């Protein structure tokens, strides 16, 4: 049974819960699709060795594992990881997804593939149980891991994303196209390369904060600047990343869906699917936060995570 916990803003979750309880008594079995296949989740894929940072803690509880979103990297969570170690005493592991950060590039970019990558690194580090926390694309990866390998995940946090196709107003296709059009001259200072890339992106990506986020992927190799994310593969698999794999069996552990109150990525339309796959979930929204909840409202984000981790 899903419960609702108010955290600054409810966004109608409790109203939906009351409606669902009434509706399920009068029309049992009609709310959710029960005949879903899992073929997409079983295809073989090559596992890659993910780059990671491990922050040591003194508490023996399950470590916290942080998964970034599209165009992000483990460096996005440096401040968050250190704060979580201080607040919880737990070890914290941050990962670079395939085709991102310092992790290898690969031709496949699907959630089953990224789930396999995460499972492999957990096995290599002898982590048999963890608190899995993922933002956006990382949230969908975390959900996939939990649904495929529930014994690995003691509890789950999905930050501003649901187990449903991502809303069509996402700007990711435009970001990819803009990044692919950026032209870099050879042998120029980093400051110049960054300024020129920002100018070229600005015609399509109007928000300066998003441009600065994309520019964290600018790296220099052999005297030439380039994007470290694998734009070609991400572009080819973008629909896979916007969708979510099909599952029938729910995850039996506790889950927190933590959304930004100013973001459309967890809406009331997603509540039925959240309850179907994650029957022991809470949905909370942080007032004043957009899609990048951890950056917009870091203090509130940390409090929500710590309260959830310590609620066992």
Curated annotation (Swiss-Prot):
The keyword Mitochondrion applies. GO terms for molecular function: carboxylic ester hydrolase activity; lipase activity. Residues 1-14 form a transit peptide. Pfam families: Abhydrolase_1. Its EC number is 3.1.1.116. Phosphorylated. The keyword Mitochondrion applies. It is an enzyme of class 3 (hydrolase). The active site is at 136 (charge relay system), 232 (charge relay system), 291 (charge relay system). Its main location: mitochondrion. SUPFAM superfamilies: alpha/beta-Hydrolases. One of its GO terms (cellular component) is mitochondrion. Residues 62-297 form the AB hydrolase-1 domain. Belongs to the AB hydrolase superfamily. Catalyzes the hydrolysis of diacylglycerol in vitro and may function as a key regulator in lipid metabolism, namely by regulating the intracellular levels of diacylglycerol. 1,2-diacyl-sn-glycerols are the preferred substrate over 1,3-diacyl-sn-glycerols. The enzyme hydrolyzes stearate in preference to palmitate from the sn-1 position of 1,2-diacyl-sn-glycerols. This is sn-1-specific diacylglycerol lipase ABHD11. The gene is abhd11.
């Amino acid at each position: 049974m899903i419960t609702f916990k108010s955290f600054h803003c409810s966004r109608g979750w409790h109203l939906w819960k009351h409606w669902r309880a009434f509706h399920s008594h009068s029309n049992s079995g009609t709310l959710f699709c029960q005949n879903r296949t899992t073929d997409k989740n079983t295809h073989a894929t090559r596992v890659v060795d993910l780059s990671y940072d491990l922050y040591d803690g003194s508490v023996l509880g399950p470590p916290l594992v942080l998964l970034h979103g599209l165009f992000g990297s483990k460096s996005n969570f440096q401040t968050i990881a250190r704060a979580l170690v201080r607040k919880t005493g737990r070890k914290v592991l941050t990962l670079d997804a395939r085709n991102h950060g310092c992790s290898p590039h690969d031709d496949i970019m699907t959630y089953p593939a990224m789930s396999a990558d995460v499972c492999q690194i957990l096995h290599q580090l002898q982590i048999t149980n963890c608190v899995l926390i993922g933002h956006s694309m990382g949230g969908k990866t975390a959900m996939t891991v939990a649904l495929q390998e529930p014994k690995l995940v003691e509890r789950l946090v999905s930050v501003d994303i649901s187990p449903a196709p991502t809303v069509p107003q996402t700007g990711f296709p435009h970001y990819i196209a803009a990044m692919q059009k950026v032209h870099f001259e050879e042998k120029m200072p980093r400051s110049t390369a960054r300024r020129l890339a920002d100018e070229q992106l600005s015609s399509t990506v109007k928000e300066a904060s998003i441009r600065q986020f994309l520019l964290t992927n600018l790296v220099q190799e052999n005297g030439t600047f380039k994007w470290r994310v694998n734009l070609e593969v991400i572009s080819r698999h973008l629909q896979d990343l916007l969708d979510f794999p099909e599952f029938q069996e729910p995850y039996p552990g506790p889950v927190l869906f933590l959304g930004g109150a100013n973001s459309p990525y967890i809406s009331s339309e997603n509540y039925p699917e959240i309850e179907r796959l994650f029957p022991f979930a809470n949905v909370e929204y942080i007032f004043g936060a957009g899609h990048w909840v951890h950056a917009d409202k870091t203090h509130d984000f940390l409090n929500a995570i710590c309260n959830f981790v310590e609620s066992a």
